[in-house]
Amino acid sequence: MFKKYDKKKLRKKRHLRVRKKIFGTSEVPRLSVYRSEKNIYAQIIDDIKGTTLVSASSVDKDFKGNGSNKEAAKVVGKMIADKAIEKGIKEVVFDRGGYIYHGRVQNLAEGAREGGLQF
């Protein structure tokens, strides 16, 4: 009999493994990514204070278009980079959220780099 693996459970397990090693401070906060079927979300977090400093997603009012493709992820990456630079954040630690660094997650990271963030 074949075992059917729960993808969400495996992703959360990978995310916990990655989060043990990644930690965001106020000087170098963490850029966290979450992707759903229809949208993509990114937020910059200070783990010491436990606060979200900046957030952007394909659900925001300034975003136009389909939120579930690679182009949308790149736009969200540029949006979060612009908001972060306005707040004086130039360097972040990238947290891929247990997802493979490919497709929408990779495009969001590239968009953030193009926007001026360093990680």
UniProtKB/Swiss-Prot annotation:
Molecular function GO terms recorded? 5S rRNA binding; structural constituent of ribosome
Q: Does the keyword RNA-binding apply?
A: yes
Cellular component aspect of the GO annotation: cytosolic large ribosomal subunit
**InterPro entries annotated for this entry?**
Ribosomal_uL18_bac-type, Ribosomal_uL18_bac/euk
What keywords were assigned to this record? Ribonucleoprotein, Ribosomal protein, RNA-binding, rRNA-binding
Cysteine disulfide links: none
Q: Name one GO biological process term.
A: translation
Partners and quaternary state? Part of the 50S ribosomal subunit; part of the 5S rRNA/L5/L18/L25 subcomplex. Contacts the 5S and 23S rRNAs.
Give the function comment from the record.
This is one of the proteins that bind and probably mediate the attachment of the 5S RNA into the large ribosomal subunit, where it forms part of the central protuberance.
In terms of NCBIfam families, this protein maps to: L18_bact
Query: Family per UniProt?
Result: Belongs to the universal ribosomal protein uL18 family.
- Indicate what this protein is called per its UniProt record: Large ribosomal subunit protein uL18
Q: Which organism is it from?
A: Clostridium kluyveri (strain ATCC 8527 / DSM 555 / NBRC 12016 / NCIMB 10680 / K1)
